[in-house]
């Protein structure tokens, strides 16, 4: 072969290699990735401490190399190296692990948030839906609502309205009138402060509607209103406020009788609110004649069953304890006293826990001593049993010698 032929062959080989490089961009990316990973490997090896030796050093190098490889494999899509290995084969294992880790992290964060405050998540309570205060959103949380125990923290389910009326109809006065039956003391106080004339109107309306109230006779001879009885059951079902577990309620040594008595006297006024079961003609769909006929029939039934002395209904105004206003000195002192009481109860719990811990350690040490003494007694018993066997053999030998003295 001549020199000219060699030049032609070398030129054709160079052009073929260039065409191969242009036609195989995956190979070029693999070479570039290999060079970058090698450079990263060298820099990591130079930055390691000199005191790392043996397997720890190799393990750290492998971890760093895997980290850089995963970063290159899952880089931005513009780089053109997403999901490819050194050989150009797509790798889905690392991406699956990263997505799985992200899903696990989100699930763990959501579970921790639900454990901290489960009533703030509407996704879990939307299916149940029948509990009071179950659909509280994060956007509606305000400081006034949290401190005042207002809406939407006290929400009455619409199905609870059916148990208030005798005929199964919905209570026509709406949610605001039902808050005196179901709601908390703060809502009752707020309604009294906002509407000071509502009590007088309610009492006058009560005096006019006492004639149409259905009164049932109990076996003990006491009067009982059917609407009040059903409303008490409704109060028990829908009394779902935020009752947190405090150290005061868990402490076995804390004296909380005065506080509980005060709470009972405050909450007793909620059940004394009268309920009128007479409904307007538009709500029931009947005429005025039907209502008058129903009232006359109820009067006849009451007159035939109950004496006239027992038909007198005494209207008692609801007893509601007035709490101190917010951001005042009395309110602050009440909060300070409550905090002090909780601190004292927490210290009591800590002392009880320390006492139990000391008694547990003392019992453990005594148990160890008794086990050690038991082992010593077992060893001594085994030694005595061995000596007893030796003495038995010696007695047998001496008896044989006494029987045969010639030997």
Curated annotation (Swiss-Prot):
This is Protein ATC1/LIC4. Involved in cation homeostasis and in the regulation of the cation stress signaling cascades. Its main location: cytoplasm. Keywords: Cytoplasm, Nucleus. One of its GO terms (cellular component) is nucleus. It is found in: Cytoplasm; Nucleus. It comes from Eremothecium gossypii (strain ATCC 10895 / CBS 109.51 / FGSC 9923 / NRRL Y-1056) (Yeast).
């Amino acid at each position: 072969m001549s020199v000219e032929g060699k030049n032609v062959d070398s030129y054709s080989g160079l052009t073929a290699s260039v065409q191969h490089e242009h036609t195989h961009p995956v190979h070029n990316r693999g070479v570039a990735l290999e060079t970058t990973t090698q450079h990263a490997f060298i820099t990591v090896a130079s930055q390691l401490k000199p005191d790392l030796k043996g397997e720890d050093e190799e393990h750290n190098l492998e971890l760093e190399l895997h980290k850089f490889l995963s970063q290159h494999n899952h880089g931005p899509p513009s780089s053109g190296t997403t999901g490819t290995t050194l050989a150009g084969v797509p790798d889905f294992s690392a991406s699956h692990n990263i997505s799985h880790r992200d899903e696990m992290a989100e699930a763990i964060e959501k579970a921790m948030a639900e454990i901290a405050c489960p009533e703030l998540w509407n996704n879990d309570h939307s299916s149940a839906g029948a509990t009071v205060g179950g659909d509280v959103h994060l956007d509606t949380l305000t400081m006034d609502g949290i401190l005042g125990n207002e809406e939407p923290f006290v929400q009455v389910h619409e199905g609870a309205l059916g148990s208030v009326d005798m005929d199964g109809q919905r209570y026509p006065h709406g949610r605001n009138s039902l808050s005196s039956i179901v709601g908390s003391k703060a809502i009752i106080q707020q309604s009294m402060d906002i509407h000071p004339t509502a009590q007088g109107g309610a009492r006058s309306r009560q005096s006019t509607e006492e004639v149409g109230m259905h009164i049932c006779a109990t076996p003990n001879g006491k009067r009982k209103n059917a609407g009040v009885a059903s409303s008490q059951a409704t109060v028990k079902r829908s009394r779902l406020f935020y009752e947190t577990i405090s150290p005061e309620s868990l402490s076995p040594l804390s004296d909380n009788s005065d506080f509980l008595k005060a709470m009972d006297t405050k909450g007793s006024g909620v059940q004394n609110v009268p309920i009128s079961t007479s409904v307007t003609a538009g709500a029931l769909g009947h005429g005025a004649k039907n209502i008058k006929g129903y009232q006359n029939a109820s009067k006849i039934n009451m007159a035939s069953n109950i004496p006239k002395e027992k038909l007198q209904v005494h209207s008692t105004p609801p007893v509601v304890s007035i709490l101190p206003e917010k951001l005042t000195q009395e309110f602050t002192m009440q909060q300070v006293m409550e905090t002090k009481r909780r601190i004292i109860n927490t210290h009591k719990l800590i002392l009880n826990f320390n006492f139990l811990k000391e008694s547990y350690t003392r019992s453990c040490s005594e148990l160890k001593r008794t086990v050690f003494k038991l082992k010593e007694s077992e060893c001594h018993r085994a030694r005595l049993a061995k000596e007893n066997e030796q003495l038995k053999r010696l007695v047998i030998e001496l008896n044989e010698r006494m029987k045969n003295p010639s030997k």
